[in-house]
């Protein structure tokens, strides 16, 4: 079987866009989390639902949570990450996410909102295929 350079997902396979996000310089951790969860997330969540985005979540990595990692310390995985938050979007098709990003409401309200809290010059992104093995404490049958 030949290996192809173009990789396309299986019809039911979900995509996951992951952003390792940094807060705007001068913004406190508390203000960043408050803004992201109470202002930005509500601003974009309805639009995501409208365009069929399956999942949108944040994991905040701050000065209270970072030291917890030392309780899990393992020499194999010992490097601490310094980002402030991981943001993940799970969706069925690229077209769904792209249509949402081209919606006038996204362009007029959501996109400019990032300047209020995010240091996009430091943030990184990746996209891959989402697969879940444990959900609500139960093994997901494969």
Curated annotation (Swiss-Prot):
EthD domain sequence ranges: 25-121
EC number: 1.-.-.-
Record's signal peptide: none
Gene Ontology molecular function, alphabetical: monooxygenase activity
Conditions for induction: Highly expressed during conidiation. A conserved conidiation regulatory pathway containing BrlA, AbaA and WetA regulates expression. During conidiation BlrA up-regulates AbaA, which in turn controls WetA. Moreover, the Hog1 MAPK regulates fungal conidiation by controlling the conidiation regulatory pathway, and that all three pigmentation genes Pks1, EthD and Mlac1 exercise feedback regulation of conidiation.
Annotated knockout phenotype: Leads to the production of dark red conidia. Does not affect virulence.
Protein's pathway: Pigment biosynthesis
Highest taxon of the lineage: Eukaryota
InterPro entries: Dimeric_a/b-barrel, EthD_dom
One Pfam short name: EthD
Gene3D superfamilies linked: 3.30.70.100
Keywords, comma-separated and alphabetical: Monooxygenase, Oxidoreductase
Keyword Oxidoreductase listed: yes
Stated family: Belongs to the tpcK family.
Function: Dehydratase; part of the Pks1 gene cluster that mediates the biosynthesis of an anthraquinone derivative pigment that contributes to conidial pigmentation that provides protection from UV radiation, heat and cold stress. The polyketide synthase Pks1 produces 1-acetyl-2,4,6,8-tetrahydroxy-9,10-anthraquinone though condensation of acetyl-CoA with malonyl-CoA. The dehydratase EthD and the laccase Mlac1 further convert the anthraquinone derivative into the final conidial pigment.
Name the record gives this protein: Conidial pigment biosynthesis dehydratase EthD
Organism, scientific name: Metarhizium robertsii (strain ARSEF 23 / ATCC MYA-3075)
């Amino acid at each position: 079987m030949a290996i192809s350079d173009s990789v396309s997902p299986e019809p039911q396979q979900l995509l996951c866009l992951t952003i390792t996000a940094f807060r705007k310089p001068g913004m406190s951790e508390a203000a960043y989390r408050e803004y992201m969860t109470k202002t930005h997330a509500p601003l974009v969540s309805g639009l995501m639902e409208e365009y069929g985005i399956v999942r949108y979540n944040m994991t905040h990595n701050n000065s209270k949570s970072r030291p917890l990692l030392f309780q899990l310390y393992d020499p194999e995985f010992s490097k601490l990450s310094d980002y402030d938050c991981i943001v993940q979007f799970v969706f069925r098709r690229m077209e769904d996410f792209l249509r949402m990003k081209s919606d006038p409401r996204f362009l007029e309200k959501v996109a400019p909102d990032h300047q209020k809290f995010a240091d996009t010059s430091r943030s990184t992104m990746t996209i891959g295929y989402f697969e879940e093995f444990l959900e609500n404490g139960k093994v997901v049958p494969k």
